[in-house]
Regions:
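Basic, Lys/Arg- and aromatic-enriched nucleic-acid-binding interface segment
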Residues: 78, 82-86, 97, 101-103, ...
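Secondary-structure transition/turn motif
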Residues: 68-72, 181-188
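N-terminal alpha-helical segment
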Residues: 16-19, 62-63, 147-148
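Short, surface-exposed polybasic/aromatic micro-patch for ligand or macromolecular engagement
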Residues: 1-13, 208-210
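Short, structural beta-strand-to-alpha-helix junction motif
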Residues: 14-19, 54, 169
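C-terminal catalytic core of Y-nucleophile DNA break-rejoin enzymes
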Residues: 181, 190-200, 204-217
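N-terminal core-binding DNA-recognition domain of tyrosine site-specific recombinases/integrases
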Residues: 12, 24-105, 123, 143-144
């Protein structure tokens, strides 16, 4: 049946990790920080165990069980599982395109997971104006934290994200006009081993993900 349907004979020997290695090698069109995050998620949650599965043997029930394990045993939030799914689904799509699978076993699995689990969504609550003033007052009057005052004052006054604020250069600031040009973000790449051990980290600047991110405030 496999040969009749165009499935490669070597499919029985190819693991999910093998397909991920190929996917990572040929994938284009992602911001570097997004790509690095995908690599981290796969290596942290998929590669050690589920990644050793033979691609041709994967069934939808296997993917369901894997996601249930992430939710029930590892306690991951739905947002993290969603990100893992984004990577896994692309890898399995490539396996289908390359004739290692007939169909993608991860199709619609995440939707079913969301229905089956009662995930709690933590709503973010913005600081009130009074709370913002109290924070700035505390920072300015506490010697231990005074060095944090300028960046918090800028972020609260402009709405800049952390990466946007920490990536500012003097050439981005016009003191006479009282404006800031936002045209890049500072990104921290934190590389870890599968066991959580750090290998090192570095910083880099990237353009915003969307055109709307480039602005003057």
């Amino acid at each position: 049946r496999d040969s009749l349907e165009g499935i490669k004979a070597e499919a029985r020997y190819v693991t999910l990790n093998d397909m991920f290695t190929l996917w990572a090698k040929v994938k284009r069109g992602l911001k570097d920080n997004t790509f690095q995050n995908y690599l981290y998620l796969y290596r942290q949650f998929v590669e050690p165990d589920f990644g050793k599965s033979k691609v041709s043997a994967l069934k939808k029930s296997d993917v369901k069980q894997f996601y249930n394990t992430l939710a029930d045993e590892r306690g991951l939030q739905i947002s993290t599982i969603d990100s893992v799914h984004t990577v896994l689904h692309q890898v399995l799509d490539m396996a289908v395109d390359d004739c290692y699978l007939r169909s993608n076993p991860s199709d619609n699995v995440l939707r079913e997971l969301k229905k089956a689990h009662q995930f709690e969504t933590n709503r973010r609550k913005a600081l009130t104006v009074t709370e913002q003033n109290l924070l700035l007052s505390y920072l300015s009057k506490t010697p231990k934290y005074q060095h944090w005052y300028p960046i918090f004052a800028v972020m609260l006054g402009t709405g800049l994200r952390v990466g946007e604020a920490t990536g500012l250069r003097w050439c981005d600031v016009d003191l006479e006009e009282g404006t800031i040009s936002v045209n890049h973000t500072l990104v921290n790449y934190d590389h870890r081993e599968n066991n959580g051990g750090r290998k090192g980290c570095y910083f880099n600047c990237h353009s915003p993900k969307t055109k709307a991110g480039v602005r003057t405030v």
